[in-house]
Each structure stands twice: as structure tokens, then as C-alpha cells.
Amino acid sequence: MENNARELNTIMRLVETFRTVDTVLPAQTAQCFLAVAIRPGLTAQNLAEMTSLSHAAVNRNIRALGKRHRYDKPGFELIETVPDPAETRRQIMFLTPKGQELAAELISALRSEEPAGS
């Protein structure tokens, strides 16, 4: 396992970066955030296909990553949804400035050589 210490340390840094958003951020929510960061302009259908999550799980995570979560709790404000110009009944997703900042921090953590937790 020692051969993999560097890679595992990198994963640890990424997890620590996600934990700055919320200490108990679900993996599904992180996965949805990353999918939107990779492919801005995704629809909920695209996101469900890309992540293999149910439509209910995708919608729950979109709300958590947006302005308002379930039960009117504040969301993380990492993504925003806007009407799709090609089909106005459909919404497409983009990172907010706060989401772009988190994506940049994740990339920085990925490239860092420092041990996790330092």
C-alpha cells in the first residue's frame, strides 16, 4: 500500500477541500458538483445519465448545491440553474462564482505536494 500513499494523500486533500463546504457533504452531492464543473450547461437528465443517479437524487442534489435546499434550508450556492434557451421548460446548470472558486481549490489541492492535514 506504501506505493499508493501519494495518490491516497491526494484523495485525502480533495476530501478535505470538499469538507470546507460542509463537514458532512454527501459523496453524491460532490459527484453532482464535479459533473457540472466538468460539463457546464448540463440538464438534470444529462446529470442523471452522467452520474447514474435517479432523477429524485439528482433533483435533491441540485437543490442542495443551489440557493435553497429541502425544507427551505439554505443551499451551498455552488451551482445555479437557468432556463435552457433551446427548451425553456428545461433548466441547465452552471457553477456560481463560489462554485468556480471551489473548483479552483480542488484543482490546487490535486496539484499540491503537501501531505493532507498540514
Regions of interest found by a model, annotated:
Residues 17-54:
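N-terminal helix-turn-helix DNA-binding core of bacterial DNA-binding proteins
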Residues 14, 97-118:
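Amphipathic alpha-helical dimerization/coiled-coil segments
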Residues 61:
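Residues within the DNA-recognition helix of helix-turn-helix
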Residues 66-73:
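C-terminal flanking helix
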Residues 76-84:
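Short, basic, alpha-helical segments at the C-terminal edge of helix-turn-helix-like DNA-binding modules
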Residues 85-103:
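Basic, amphipathic "hinge/linker" alpha-helix immediately C-terminal to the N-terminal HTH DNA-binding motif
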